[in-house]
Structure formats: structure tokens, C-alpha cells
């Protein structure tokens, strides 16, 4: 294919104010990172709680966590996003509806919807990783803690979870990378994250190949950097004698 690449397009004016196409990418990357970080905070927090719930010796508690996982893991992310953005606001009390629909600007409401949606969707996956990490520990860990007089919350907080987190760093890293990639669904509800800015650049500049090539390089560089960083963290906190789940 005889195609003349024009990489200088990113430094040209978009025709909207004084912005260049590169400015659009920077703005989109900022939204992508913000969505991913906020969603990951939700996922790691709730996923840890539900992961613990799935391993406690109480059928009701573990059953609640199991139901959550099965529901959120088996409904497509895009369907969940549309539910959170179009349906859930109409189910809120009138005061919250007015705040969400009238006081918030469309960008903020879209941001909140995608953060909650992606956070709760990823929670189900993190829950399973935490459960696997806890169950991978030697049974003697819990028995020894009980013999020392630890109560169940103390056993999880002081003994099981610190070790479980260390051995599930590889799969948690994969989930974190998935969060970054899944932020692209935000473009479907009007949030101008990286993918949306890429499509807008392609439409305005007519440089389709350059626009999506740059987006691909940004996603690849970001995810590879995170993966390499987490490999260093994994080596730093590795527990001698324990094998990482999904690792070597």
C-alpha cells in the first residue's frame, strides 16, 4: 500500500481555539488515567472485601459474595455501562436525580457512571483473585493464628491478606491493565477519553492511520510500563517459599 504518513498532523491546529491534535490526545489520556485509577480503587477495595467474604466459614456471607460475582462477571460490560448511565439515574430519589441530571455537567455525569460501572465490574474479577490467593496459602497459617488467640478479622488482616496480596500480584496486574483498556467504553456515552479523542482526530484531520497508530502506541506504552513496574514490585515483596498465582 502506497501511503504517505503525515506525523506532523498532530502539531497542527484543530480549528477549535488554539488547540492542536496532540492537545486532544493529552486531554483524552488524562481522562483515561483518571477513570482507570478511580475504578481500580473501587475494584481493589470492594474486591478484597468480597474475596474475604467468599472464604469465610459462613454460607450466607459467602453466598452473597458469590451472587455478586456471578451477576457482574456474566453480564457484558457494555450492557452494565448503559444500565448505569441511562437507567440507574432514573431510579434515584428525586433530589439525587435533580443533582445528577441538572447540577452536574454531561462530562461529569458520564465520568461518574463509567467509574462506578467499571469499578463494580472489575470488583467481581478482583474478588476471585483475592479468594484464590487466600486459598493458596497453607492451611497451617490460619490454624497457627487461631492457636495464638487471633479473632477471625485479625487473622485475615494480619496473617492471610498480607501474604495473599503478594502472591496474586501477577493476576492483579493483569486486571489493572484490563481496567485501562476497558476505559475505551466511555467513548460510547460521550466522555472524551483517549479513544474518543482518537476518533475525533481521525474525523477532523482525515488522517485515520496516523490517529489510530498513535493511540495504539500510547496504550501499548502505558500498559507495558505498568507491567514492568509491577514485576519489580512483585520481586520486591515476594515471600520466600510461596509461589505467585499466575507467576513462576
Model-identified regions with their sequence ranges:
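Transmembrane alpha-helices and adjacent helix-loop boundaries
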Residues: 1-248
